[in-house]
Amino acid sequence: MHTKSQDLTILTSPPASGKTYWISKLQEVLKSDQILVISPLRALADECREKWGEKICVMTPEEWLVKKTFREVVIFDEFHLFFYWGDSFRPMMWEVFFEISLFSSQTWLLTATLSEEMKEDISLFSTQFDQILWLDHGNQVLKFKPTRYLKAPDKKWIMSQIENEIPAKDVKLVFCQYREEVFSYARKLTASGFTCLTCVGGESRFMAMKLKNNSSPDFIISTTVLSHGVNLPDIKTIYFLYPVNNLDFWIQMTARGGRRGQNYKVIALDVPQGLEWNPWQNTIHILWQNLLRFISLKCFFLKT
């Protein structure tokens, strides 16, 4: 019979607010062999191992199932993904969670996005834990908000803006709904003279290598796979080619811009969540962009 006192602590804070740094500081207080970090993101796990070396044990859920390593303190990073992925195509994530926490005295859940439904499910964990504590430093909010958020009239309008960007000015991030669209749009932009990097599900762990070879592409084109984990260069513009319709993922994807507090803008199809946004100013900006586009085309045809 297991009689060890078990505490569960949930720490919510915005993306890019230093949760990984907090783990590093925790390691300075505790002994290295007391901490285990479980990351559902292989790319992030690889990055942490490279950063921390043997100071902190970091594993994906799949790696843990092979090694079965236990520690007094276990930290589950990006815990919201346990609900999204553990309830669908990676059910072993829940098996890992309950088995590890059963033999740990302190269990920490780190996330930037915890929905009401997730909170209700976590409250049911009281059957396993003696105490559940929530440290809320900001949930489902952005630390660095975009300096401009433009709600586009349609996808075609956004694509027109993308295709009229200036090559090599800065790095833009384009989110597509489907992997086939990622590759087809990258081919189209490459044919127009832009440099592009792509990333779809299963490829995030190779993104760091791609960025080493080309650290400042014109466009990074991806599915939601780049909403988490992978370190990206400074992103000045984020384009959404589809309505996200999920606050958690919208927060994570939008937070890829301005990671270090720089200005960035977002052009999307969703009405922004938690941002000061004026529909009239948005309409005026759309009309202004259309006018500039019209003048540009007219000048082009006059020259030809």
Predicted regions and their residues:
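Conserved helicase ATPase core of P-loop NTP-dependent helicases/translocases
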Residues: F194-T223
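Conserved two-lobed SF2 helicase motor
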Residues: D7, G53-K68, N213-V230
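SF2 helicase motor core recognition
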Residues: T20, L65-K67, F219-I238, Q252-Q262
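Post-DEXD/H (motif II) to motif III coupling segment of the RecA-like Helicase ATP-binding lobe
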Residues: H80-L135
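Interdomain hinge/linker at the junction between the two RecA-like core domains of SF2 helicases
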Residues: E116-E165
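Conserved Walker A/P-loop ATP-binding site and its immediately adjacent core
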Residues: P14-W52, E116-K119, R179-E180
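Conserved strand-helix element at the start of the C-terminal RecA-like helicase core
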Residues: D33-A45, M118, N164-T190, C196-L197
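Conserved segment of the helicase C-terminal RecA-like domain
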Residues: L241, D248-Q252, R256-I284
